[in-house]
Amino acid sequence: LGQQKTEVLLNIDTKDHYKSFKTTKVEIKTDLYNTVINKKLSADILNRQLEFIQRFLGTYPHKKLFIDEASQAKNPIYGLNQLPKFIRPFPDVFEWDLTMLKAMSKKYIDNTLLLDKREDYWLTDGLQTYLMMNYVSEYYPEIKLTGNISKIWGLKNFNFSKLNFNDKYPFIYQYTARQFLDQSLNTRANSLSNFNRKIVGKYKAGLGLRYLADYIGDTIISASFQEFYLKNKLNYAKSDDFKKIVSSKTIKDLSWFFEDYLKTNKKIDYTIKK
């Protein structure tokens, strides 16, 4: 019991609030579900999420994956999970899908990749944000940042109403950088401001991986993720291991990413190709 497990989840309650969902390879147990969405559709969505993460990383080494609401509440999707109940700019399926994906991807990564959370957090945070961005691009390319609010007369002509959901990442990061509030990604976790630790640092790390993918190619970055995951799954690893893997697959100079982008606050105008 507990062999090769990186986390022990204790749930003490008089009632079992967890539901079990069977995917093709892993049983998912969670108390984070939407009663409006039927169980079959929920299972289909969870299966799609799991296959998506496995496509980028590799197979999950355990038979069960526990996703609890308490952990998700500490790592919400800012701008989505904090909206009042009476404001519903996004469809129920979209909101639950992304909420579960963020919770699942964090559990998946934390349960398999053992990196120093004080120094190498940028890689796990960046990988999770990278997965979120790619998932939305693949399955929800039409969703706007403001959801259905963007269609309201009087608002739809404003530039912000035309932004896609994924545009929030560069928008928030660049705004923070212009205010000189961002911190470098090699800043120790205990020295980060709450805003950088919870939001900006994660966005900056994920965007950095997207910029890197544009620079060296999606094929190379995907192969690097998979090799890093395969070599280090359930073992202690360092972000330098990822650097060595990526560097071995390209002759391009990567110092702009591993030195300037990660270790400084240099203001460079990066763009992501559509």
Spell out what each predicted region is.
Residues 9-121, 127-135, 139, 194:
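Juxtacatalytic substrate-recognition/specificity segment
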Residues 1-11:
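Extended, low-hydrophobicity, Ser/Thr/Pro/Gly-biased non-transmembrane segments
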Residues 119, 125-207, 232:
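Acidic/His/Gly-enriched intrinsically disordered linker/tail segments
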Residues 55-59, 71-76, 169-181, 205, ...:
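Glycine-rich, acidic and aromatic/proline-enriched surface loops and short helix-turn segments
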Residues 61-68, 118-119, 142-147, 223-224, ...:
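Surface-exposed patches in mature extracellular/periplasmic domains of secreted proteins
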Residues 36, 61, 194-274:
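Amphipathic alpha-helical substructures
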